[in-house]
Amino acid sequence: FLIIFSMILNPVLAEDIPIIVISPSQKAQSKSTVGTSVTVFDQSKIEKSNDFFLGDLMGSDTTSFNSFQSGGYGSASGIQLRGLPKRYSTVFIDGVKQSDPSSVSGDFDFSHILKNQISRAEVLKGNQSSVYGSGAIGGAINIVTKRGQPGFQKNINYNTASHGTHNLALSMSGADDKNDFYIGYERFVTDGISAMDNNDEEDAYRNNTIVANYGYKFNDKLKIENNVRVAQGYLQYDTL
């Protein structure tokens, strides 16, 4: 069970150029001016992917990453940068550093991040320890959840697959000159496949995720943002 809450004061950024939220200078800048190797998974790439989870989507880019998963959906998964163990890749969600308190090394687990609530993921590859600490020797990953866009939108997205797999995503969002908001709910269920040979018992997985973001623009230089993300996962697994 994971709850993430953050309140961030950010300068308002121009929207007419590609923006990298994390960078060696910790300042937003265009991709073309970042002096290190960068991969961006934008909204278009996320929507076109057939994967349910962000970690699977990112792992499909084998030219940039090494990804692993210890089993089926819901089992521990991670992203390795520059061939280093995942503990050397620092992960942020909406600018807040993430870690897994249940892990001895604090490695971040990608297994519960469903893609439909994510706006983009930005990856800096190579040593970023001078900026983000020793945990960023391999690089840094910043995950950005969705925010409201001008007007009012309601979205429903449903996908199904084999082994009793279903994915439902609901959201509503909007923005005006001062305010923006996004509220999203996503549910993923699957009967799974047993990790043991000759075993008819399946390893089921359930995931419920809620994202709620609100922003208020005071002026052209100051904006306050509140970000809440709650993810609950339930996994059945075999003891070999």
How should each PLM-predicted stretch be described?
Residues 63-75, 101-104, 133-137:
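Short, glycine-/polar-rich solvent-exposed loops and beta-turns at beta-strand/coil boundaries
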Residues 20, 54-61, 77-80, 89-92, ...:
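N-terminal periplasmic accessory domains that precede
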Residues 19-49, 78, 86:
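N-terminal periplasmic "start-of-domain" segments of outer-membrane beta-barrel proteins
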Residues 142, 150-151, 159, 171-240:
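Periplasmic-side early beta-strands and strand-to-turn transitions of outer-membrane beta-barrels
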Residues 38, 46, 58, 121-122, ...:
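Non-catalytic regulatory/gating segments with a bias toward low-complexity or hydrophobic composition
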Residues 97-125:
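Short acidic/polar hinge/loop motifs at secondary-structure boundaries
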Residues 68, 108, 130-132, 157-159, ...:
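Outer-membrane beta-barrel domain signature
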Residues 72, 111, 134, 161-165, ...:
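Transmembrane beta-barrel outer-membrane domains
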